[in-house]
Curated annotation (Swiss-Prot):
One of its GO terms (cellular component) is GET complex. Homodimer. This is ATPase ASNA1 homolog. Belongs to the arsA ATPase family. ATPase required for the post-translational delivery of tail-anchored (TA) proteins to the endoplasmic reticulum. Recognizes and selectively binds the transmembrane domain of TA proteins in the cytosol. This complex then targets to the endoplasmic reticulum by membrane-bound receptors, where the tail-anchored protein is released for insertion. This process is regulated by ATP binding and hydrolysis. ATP binding drives the homodimer towards the closed dimer state, facilitating recognition of newly synthesized TA membrane proteins. ATP hydrolysis is required for insertion. GO terms for molecular function: ATP binding; ATP hydrolysis activity. GO terms for biological process: tail-anchored membrane protein insertion into ER membrane. Gene3D superfamilies: P-loop containing nucleotide triphosphate hydrolases.
Length: 377
């Protein structure tokens, strides 16, 4: 059975033994956790990651001394969310004195520290040695980036990450670096003899010790970053999804990968959830009885049209709730005993501007039952 098949199967599991939710259905515990330094927010594209990460950052600003919201998503939606332009330098968000935002590019940079000593030999040989490690250039850039972030003096950093596939690649970089740099270190003695021989025949000055000092530094840095990732007291991941198949599927894939990499994850935010409406359903037969009592033909036609449209809207609403309930049930059965599952309502308009983000952030603190649709029949 393929990984995709096994994941698909896991999404159809139902638990007959499921009783009460043991975990709160809000993010209060996450926000009150004073030991966390890094909070990653991720999921499929278009599920509300940026809105969720911005809201978490706003709430943390009420509880922590200094907060940085850091976007690693190439789309950089944080500027649009706050209606404020951000750059690759921390910028204070309007109306705050302790909440900053920056938008960075995690792709390869010419400034990565692995551009060690400019020698023709080094520049030609080292890339050849690393060809067996695809993505190493991005990994090196990521290591430099994470080391810089680690040295920043913020109480907590909230990462608004790119869609799932890109995020999983980033999370794999520390292990990739560990393998690649370990490979170079293991070649030290062989390289030393080769370089000394080359030096005796050429005028190239190859500072081997300086090169390996840099390699050892990068290796120590990657180990430190991986250690930070795997420390549940310092780092956690918040998964964001919507109650649709592809989103739930990617959430399961993300959680499995996080588990393999020993990265803490115990919060799931489910956005765009249609909650029950506090209004009576349309009783068509009752309406038809009322219709017969109306003598005015125009009023009768208008009333009939209104009843029909109302019934159509109700059918759409019920269909939507039934479809969402299928995936909400799967989310509840798969994660209800181990995760804080927070259902956020489908809203009338997009979340933009500080006021709307603040209002949305308050809803992250409210406990709400997972709204599974149950027909009265």
């Amino acid at each position: 059975m393929s990984d995709a098949d096994s994941l698909s199967c896991s999404l159809t599991l139902e638990s007959d033994e499921y009783d009460e939710e043991e975990y709160d259905t809000n993010l209060s515990k996450l926000l009150e956790n004073k030991t966390l330094n890094w909070i990653f927010v991720g999921g499929k594209g278009g599920v509300g990651k940026t809105t969720t990460s911005c809201s978490i950052a706003v709430q943390l600003a009420k509880r922590r001394e200094s907060v940085l919201l850091l976007s690693t998503d190439p789309a950089h939606n944080t500027s649009d969310a706050f209606n404020q332009k951000f750059t690759n330098q921390p910028t204070l968000i309007n109306s705050f004195d302790n909440l900053y935002c920056m938008e960075i590019d995690t792709t390869y940079s010419e400034n990565t520290a692995f551009k060690l000593n400019k020698t023709e030999f080094f520049d030609s040989i080292i890339p050849e040695l690393l060809q067996s490690f695809p993505g190493i250039d991005e990994a090196l850039c990521f290591a430099e980036l994470m080391q810089s972030i680690k040295n920043m003096k913020y109480s907590v950093i909230v990462f608004d990450t790119a869609p799932t596939g890109h995020t999983l690649r980033l999370l794999a970089f520390p292990e990739l670096l560990k393998k690649a740099l370990g490979y170079l270190i293991s070649l030290r003695e062989k390289l030393k003899g080769t370089l000394n021989m080359l030096k005796s025949f050429t005028n190239n000055e190859v500072e081997l010790e300086g090169i390996y000092e840099k390699i050892n530094h990068l290796n120590a840095m990657s180990i430190s970053i991986q250690s930070n990732f795997q420390n549940p007291l310092k780092t956690t991941f918040v998964c964001v999804c919507i109650p649709e198949f592809l989103s739930v599927y990617e959430t399961e894939r993300l959680i499995q990968e996080l588990t393999k990499k020993n990265i803490s994850c115990y919060n799931i935010v489910v956005n765009q959830v249609v909650f029950p409406l506090d209004c009576p359903t349309v009783n068509v037969s009752h309406c038809e009885g009322l219709l017969k009592q109306i003598k005015d033909k125009k009023i009768q036609e208008s009333f009939s049209s209104l009843v029909q449209k109302t019934k159509e809207l109700e059918d759409v609403y019920i269909s939507r709730r039934k479809l969402q309930s299928k995936y909400l049930t799967q989310i509840k059965n798969l994660y209800g005993n181990d995760f804080h599952i927070v259902c956020m309502p489908q809203l009338k308009s997009e979340i933009r501007g500080l006021e709307n983000i603040s209002n949305f952030s308050e809803m992250l603190l409210e406990s709400k039952d997972i709204p599974i649709y149950r027909s009265e029949g």
